[in-house]
Amino acid sequence: MKFGREFETQMIQEWKEAYMDYRSLKSIVKQILRYRLQKQQRPPPPPPPPSTGDTVPLKTDGGEGGGGGGGGGPGLSRRISLYRAFSGLTNRASRSPKKSHKHHNPLSSKRHHHHHNHHHYHLFDDDEEQIILINEDETASYTTTFLNSAEEGGEMEVQFFRRLDGEFNKVLRFYKQKVENVMEEADELSRQLNVLIALRVKVENPHVHLPPDLNSVASAPSSPHSTMRTPAPSPMDVIREMEKTEDKKVFKPAPVEMLDHVKLKIDPETPLLTLKMMILGLPSEQTFSKPELRRAEELMNRAFVEFYQKLRFLKSYCFLNQLAFAKILKKYDKTTSRNASKPYLNTVDHSYLGSCDEVSRLMSRVEATFIKHFANGNHREGMKCLRPKTKREKHRITYFLGFFSGCAVALAIAITVLVHIRGLTKSEGRHQYMENIFPLYSLFGFVAVHLFMYAADIYFWSRYRVNYPFIFGFEQGNDLGYREVLLVGSGLAVLTFGGVISNLDMEMDPRTKSFSVITELVPLALLVCLMMVLFCPFNIIYRSSRYFFVGSVFRCLLSPLYKVILPDFFLADQLTSQVQTFRSLLFYVCYYGWGGDFKRRTHTCYDSEIYKELYLVVAIIPYWFRFAQSIRRLVEEKDKMHGLNALKYLSTILAVAARTIFEMKRGTYWLTVAVTTSSIATLFNTYWDIFRDWGLMNRNSKNPWLRDKLLVPYKSIYFIVMVANVVLRLAWMQTVLGIKEAPFLHKRALVAVVASLEIVRRGIWNFFRLENEHLNNVGKYRAFKSVPLPFQELGGSKSV
């Protein structure tokens, strides 16, 4: 793989715009190469122009003499020193402060140009020509002067160095800002951990009273970092309970008195806590109980893990950009036969990007602190928690995916052949089968279609580098890829088709006047198996993903009482497209319960008043989830857009209720109500899909009527999916227009087709919804989760 593609693959996608623009610099180098090739073909062979005669010795000196000899040994050592400078950032602490912290660049000139020239000539061989001059101003911005700009074609090289300086300064500013941010966060984590240690002391010994002299060291506040070039101790150095003296260790406990000035922030995360805080309010006094300690330790654990991830990202950002500068300058040298990479890379090495080792030093402090305070001194367990889990691609997943897919296709063909051979479409029992058995199996079909659409979404999210695991908050290393989701969907399809084949008999036993009990219980057995797998406590069949799904469903069921997060309202949106699945579940209860005789394939569910009421309720429930979530977010965030979103779902609830009542009662009045409410809901939902969820239809954007940033390279795709979304939104017209059956389709099959089209529409919506969310994260450089800290000062909202 070429470096450009590898560079884009290894990027932190949310920081993509902050990386060096390797592609644009490479395009300028290609322009220089094309110009030089044309220049070589332009003049006739004899006699060469004077400019060519002047150029040949320079090329010989740079390529064979000074450039070859000086670029072979020193150039190679320069590249090695570049990699060593990055990988050994933790070793820079052992160097002298002058080299480690002062960003003195012998190639940059601020005021004394003679000093610059002195060092410059020491970096070139005697027969090498000085090509560039690099200056650094008071704002730590670098400007490169190309000294051979008067040459023919020199303006392109001037453009190259101007663009290179712009990218270098951009990277420097971003990196310095992020380092300052993590240093401030390290200060806050230090104070938070100091309070946590005091809380531990208080909980384990509530009556402890420590003399002030023992608390003096532990209570010493962390000094703010005025500059990162001073050899002051890292913020993590203040977190110490044990200090060595000459001969023994002296115990330095954290000051318990600091607990009088802070309070534990307990966000209600369970319905019981939410109701309790709504009724009683926040507790006025600290109890210093073990549950509070466990909660604080859990939050601090998550905060340290997330903070360590930030440091890893910064370290990767630093290394990749240094490597990109080395690669593009090497390509420039090869194209122009010059040796400009040596001075420029030396500047990079002595800049803040190459010489600041605060990130690596802070990483080692975080590791030591986390292992000591959260892993009981177990280095392996501590690093296992801090480092992200790498996902292993397993060949058996691909094998079983192919196996189950082949089985599903074979069974589908077998069903088609059996229906044709037996003439089941013209059988007397066809209507009985479609009214009783087909709705049972259609439930699994809806779930399988949704799984296939979700797998397609994951594939395209990965292809266009949408960071969906971060957006959904999946556990690192345990998130499912599209192969795993396809495997689950194909396995479910195999079980469903196998059950359908067992129930294809259309005639009862003439002796018993009933169907086989075993075959009639196959759909129920499949449903029970599906539920058992979903709630299986053993670590099989993607337990972490199953539990994540079950937990999200549970929070949706109690929507107003839980804080709304993206995975929960995203799942609730998925459930709004599975209304027919909920109705199929209701039919299961009725058919195998109070209203059916499964042995004779008869039921009275559609005549039951209870069933009719529940038929309406289960269709509204998914939209109620989203309505309640929007109200909760409106109350918490005070954003009026959540209120409008709640109105959108309320209009949909009214439309679904009106269509359901019209389906049961008919009549002109309910037809008018159904058409009116459905039209309003369709317009509202279509506007929200395109304008709000997808962020499209911006006429002033760089891409007219779309948005400024697009991940899909073909703009026509966006217009096609907008039209498709509107068309699929109108599937409700099948109900109000009274379309009961289509050619070769039973009315139950038609309902299943319409429901499947809604699932397909939801799958399309998913991709562009997450694309817009990802681009919002990119625009805000939001690559980390916000983890709340457990303690804050009394009388204020600030953390400790």
Curated annotation (Swiss-Prot):
The chain crosses the membrane at residues 399-419, 440-460, 484-504, 521-541, 671-691, 719-739. InterPro entries: EXS_C, PHO1_SPX, SPX_dom. Pfam families: EXS (PF03124), SPX (PF03105). Specifically expressed in pollen grains. It is a multi-pass membrane protein. Residues 216-229 have a biased composition (Polar residues). Residues 42-51 have a biased composition (Pro residues). Residues 38-77, 91-119, 212-234 are annotated as: Disordered. It comes from the Eukaryota. Its main location: membrane. Residues 95-119 have a biased composition (Basic residues). May transport inorganic phosphate (Pi). Belongs to the SYG1 (TC 2.A.94) family. This is Phosphate transporter PHO1 homolog 9. It comes from Arabidopsis thaliana (Mouse-ear cress).
